[in-house]
Every structure is written in structure tokens, then in C-alpha cells.
UniProtKB/Swiss-Prot annotation:
Organismal lineage: Bacteria, Bacillati, Bacillota, Bacilli, Bacillales
Residues reported in the UniProt entry to bind FMN: 132-134, 251-252, 296, 311-315, 337
Organism expressing this protein natively: Staphylococcus aureus (strain bovine RF122 / ET3-1)
Subunit structure as annotated in this protein's UniProt entry: Homotetramer.
Protein name: Chorismate synthase
HAMAP family: Chorismate_synth
One GO process term, biological-process aspect: chorismate biosynthetic process
EC number: 4.2.3.5
Signal sequence region: none
Pathway, per record: Metabolic intermediate biosynthesis; chorismate biosynthesis; chorismate from D-erythrose 4-phosphate and phosphoenolpyruvate: step 7/7
Catalysis: reaction(s): 5-O-(1-carboxyvinyl)-3-phosphoshikimate = chorismate + phosphate
Length: 388
């Protein structure tokens, strides 16, 4: 299973082609659009999300509500393109027209791809870099993840997310499954404790008023995974390695951990390893889940717990110092419309990126041409956990 996205932030549309989805999977576009809507929300979002109405159009690979087994193409229209048609269109424009529109960027923003991307691809107008490196591309990745969540639901695998920390203000590290699921999306910062939610809003407002931005930590949980997905045999087949690569490929994500993560370094092994237990109903299970459902690069049947660290968004309304690439003079960096905090939205993006990595790993483990075949193999693997 793989996908390829295309499109620029202010171009006409984002397009994604997904290959490897089994045939006969029931897909409703409203299910995908419901997930797309979640990405647009969250306290601290900028004006761009008031312009866009992200909805997906499926243009191939699905017929009469069911996948065909062929590549699935989805399109997300950029409504803001109406204001950028001339500058972002494919047709050539004159230097005079470009200058009159004041859209050329020569002052790179610290923390963005602007300067290094301009060097790498020889772009003197850094808009050519920022348009593709923008987090707008994550809308297409959420569409892919939403499709994967439909697949996972058919396999009785649940995936959900929350915010753990914003700007140094922390929610509890872990909640039991029922509390977690019962409180999803209860507020606009996606934390479970309402008192902490208000403190986070105040912190976001403070950053916005200062022309600054703040980051945080998000958590994704995958429940009811069959055992043995991934492999200890080769480095590139380890499930935690694949999930980690997916998470840190999200714009502004700078770290990832599993289970107790970096706190494991503070404790002795006797407090971190999860003891193995058995009963006839569950089969093998663990007495705790400090390792986050992963052992030896494989799922062990316990919930997979993924923690992702997002740095503050580098576009600031109180811009940092930079250098004009044409004149080499010191300037304040270019200001582009942006969010003061995108951590709540990033938790949704992270959830869908993990959903893709899980679905991809499952389809490699249980190679299937159609959904019925895949379901049967999953049933057999779950039974193995009891009978082994």
C-alpha cells in the first residue's frame, strides 16, 4: 500500500492517489469528509481554515460505494485559489505582473524550508518552496488516513488521538481506554480535563497576542491490533520504526516515542518491562503497557501508544531576523498567514498518518486482494494468540 500527493498550498487543488487498498471495502465519502472536518478545527487556528471547506471528491477506484482494488484518486479543492489564480496558475506571467502582485518572496523564514529549499532547487522566488512545503499538504494525508480508518474499522481495530501538552501545560499522561474514548473532541484543544483545556486556551491567546506561536505533544492510540505485525528480522520491517518515520515526516514534528517513551530512561527495567500473562479468553496479554504495545519491532496485542512532539509553528507575526537572498541585507522574515497553535489539528493529522502506517503494515503481513480475505486472516492471527 502506498500513496502519492500533489498540489501547492494556494494552487487549485490537492490530489492523492492511493494504491493497494483491497477490493470490496465499503467506502462512504461522508466518512472521509467527517475526518477532514476535524483537521480544520482546534483552538489557535488561523484565518485560512475559515476560507477552506475541505471536502474530498473520489474520482477513481471506488464504484457504487465499494473499492475496486485499483488505485483510488481523491481530490481536495483549494477554495483560496480564487484569490491566487494569477500568481499560482500554470500560465506564464511577466516580471512586471509578478512585481505588481507583490507575491515574490526573497526573505526566508527561520525554521521553514524556504532558504535550504531555494538553494537545493535553485528557486530565487522562495514561494516556489513554501507552497509545497506548507502543512496544507496534510489535508491530503488526512484523506488517506481516513480511508485507512475505514479499512481498520472493518478489522475491528480502533484508532483515536488527543492532545497531551500545549506550551508546557500538560494533561495526564495516560487515561484508561473507556475514559479516553468517551471524551474525544469534548473541547477545542482536544484534552480530557476541561480545567487544563482553559489553561491551554489562555496560553494560546498569550502567544497570539505576543505575535508568537507554541507547540506541544499529541498522543495516538491503536486498539485491538493482532499480534506479530511488523518484524524483528530486518530494521526496515520494524513497526515502531515505520510509525516513527511517518510521524516525524509531519510538518513541524520533531520527536516521537512509544508508551512511556523517554520516561523509560528514568526507571529500572523491573518497572518498565511488561509482564506476560495468560487466560483462556484473551490468550497472552501483558500486565501493564509501559512499552506501548510494541516489542521487538512487532505488535504484541496491547494498545499501541504513540506520542508525537510538535515544535511551535515557525511563521511568526513578530518575525525573527533573516537575510534577503537578493540583497544579502538583514530584514525581518516574511510574514505568511498562519496559526498561533496547531497542536489540536496536528493530533488529527498524526492519528491519520499512524492509521496509514498501521494499514500498510497489516496489508504486508496479510496479503489480500479483497476485504473478505483480509478479515479471515486477521481472525486466524487473533486465534493464534489464544492457541499458541
Amino acid at each position: 500500500m502506498r500513496y502519492l500527493t500533489s498540489g501547492e498550498s494556494h494552487g487549485p487543488q490537492l490530489t492523492v492517489i492511493v494504491e493497494g487498498v483491497p477490493a470490496n471495502l465499503e467506502v462512504k465519502v461522508e466518512d472521509i469528509n467527517r475526518e477532514m472536518f476535524k483537521r480544520q478545527g482546534g483552538y489557535g487556528r488561523g484565518r485560512r481554515m475559515q476560507i477552506e471547506k475541505d471536502t474530498v471528491e473520489i474520482v477513481s477506484g471506488v464504484r457504487n460505494g465499494y473499492t475496486l482494488g485499483s488505485p483510488i484518486t481523491m481530490v481536495v479543492t483549494n477554495d483560496d485559489f480564487t484569490h491566487w489564480r494569477k500568481i499560482m496558475g500554470a500560465a506564464p506571467i511577466s516580471d512586471e505582473e509578478r512585481e505588481n502582485m507583490k507575491r515574490t518572496i526573497t526573505k526566508p523564514r527561520p525554521g521553514h524550508a524556504d532558504l535550504v529549499g531555494g538553494m537545493k532547487y535553485n528557486h530565487r522566488d522562495l514561494r516556489n518552496v513554501l507552497e509545497r512545503s506548507s502543512a496544507r499538504e496534510t489535508a491530503a494525508r488526512v484523506a488517506v488516513g481516513a480511508l485507512c480508518k475505514v479499512l481498520l474499522e472493518q478489522l475491528d481495530i480502533e484508532i483515536y488521538s488527543r492532545v497531551v501538552e500545549i506550551g508546557g501545560i500538560k494533561d495526564k499522561d495516560f487515561y484508561d481506554s473507556e475514559t479516553f474514548k468517551a471524551n474525544l473532541d469534548r473541547n477545542d484543544v482536544r484534552v480530557i480535563d476541561d480545567g487544563i483545556a482553559q489553561a491551554m486556551r489562555d496560553k494560546i491567546d498569550e502567544a497570539k497576542n505576543d505575535g508568537d506561536s507554541i507547540g506541544g505533544v499529541v498522543q495516538v492510540v491503536v486498539e485491538n491490533m493482532p499480534v506479530g505485525v511488523g518484524s524483528y528480522v530486518h530494521y526496515d520491517r520494524k513497526l515502531d520504526g515505520r510509525i516513527a518515520q511517518g510521524v516525524v515526516s509531519i510538518n513541524a514534528f520533531k520527536g516521537v516515542s512509544f508508551g512511556e517513551g523517554f520516561k523509560a530512561a528514568e526507571k529500572p527495567g523491573s518497572e518498565i518491562q511488561d509482564e506476560i500473562l495468560y487466560n483462556t479468553e484473551l490468550g497472552y496479554y501483558r500486565g501493564s503497557n509501559h512499552l506501548g504495545g510494541l516489542e521487538g519491532g512487532m505488535s504484541n496485542g496491547m494498545p499501541i501508544i504513540v506520542n508525537g512532539v510538535m515544535k511551535p509553528i515557525p511563521t511568526l507575526y513578530k518575525p525573527l531576523n533573516s537575510v534577503d537572498i537578493n540583497t544579502k541585507e538583514d530584514f525581518k522574515a516574511t510574514i505568511e498567514r498562519s496559526d498561533s497553535c496547531a497542536v489540536p489539528a496536528a493530533s488529527i493529522v498524526c492519528e491519520h498518518v499512524v492509521a496509514f502506517e498501521i494499514a500498510k503494515a497489516l496489508l504486508e503481513e496479510f496479503q489480500s486482494n479483497h476485504i473478505e480475505q483480509l478479515k479471515q486472516q486477521i481472525i486466524e492471527r487473533r486465534q493464534l494468540n489464544i492457541e499458541f
